[in-house]
Amino acid sequence: MYHIPAMLEETIAGLNIKPDGVYVDVTFGGGGHSRAILDRIAEGVRSQESGIRTKIRSQKSEVRTQLYSFDQDIEAYGNAIDDARWQFVHGNFRYLANFMDYFGVTEIDGLIADLGVSFHHFDEAERGFSFRFDAPLDMRMNRQGGRTAADLINNYSEDELARVFALYGELKNAKPLARRLIQARPVATTGDVLRALGISGEIDPRRKKELTCLFQALRIEVNDELGALREMLVAARDLLKPGGRIAVLTYHSLEDRIVKNFLRSGNLEGEIQKDFYGNILTPFRLIEKGRSASEEEVARNPRARSAKLRVGEKV
């Protein structure tokens, strides 16, 4: 099961979809956003055609790709869309610029990124994303290559492991956690992690929060999630047409900080540039500045509680 998209209507509305536009969904997953984009394109086409009833077309318009959907997990292709306007891209969104160049796309009208991890990954024990199961400690989004979370624990130094826990899990006790895991080597499963930390049976809320942060840190490091996000944002900025929009859903403070600063400044450093007269120079006009889901939506979809929507329009 893939997660129910948070703020779906608000996100799609934020893209301001044009019927003849070209769009990118860099986090295809279950395909919820991609299907909504294609539906909105079709609605726009029907609206245009109904308004030009007297125009006689000499030939049928050629169908072209209008939506490119990325996912580095090949299992997502099981949710493929039967639509000639749609193209699946099996790859990490950090390579957005490379893939668009390959497809001959030089500019786009919009891009959406839902940075949440799918229920699909948490609920499949063998993926190793959740401490609810005693399973191989994998955590790779793309299982066709790369290092696993077990590889990190078994090969990183104590300082390196502590850095990961402190930076990506924001854990104040990162050092002792790293030490206990290293002392328990070799670590192969999620259960090994719990046993190394002296956790068994029912987990109390404090330890559960600690484990959640620790597993988040390992997942971010294994997949270089923040590095990939930074590269994707730069590529999106360069590909967007004037008037084109980028919509990003974030779920934790680390990724939200990166997106917020980038949309405000247009650069990864978050430095606001000004002209000679002191006017702010930025490639984006902010449309949504961290919108949260409504109480009604959170009641239906508790996962939406931590979601924040940010939308920027290229100027």
Q: Model-predicted segments: where are they?
A:
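S-adenosyl-L-methionine-dependent methyltransferase catalytic core, i.e., the SAM/SAH-binding region
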Residues: M1-G44, R53, R64-V315
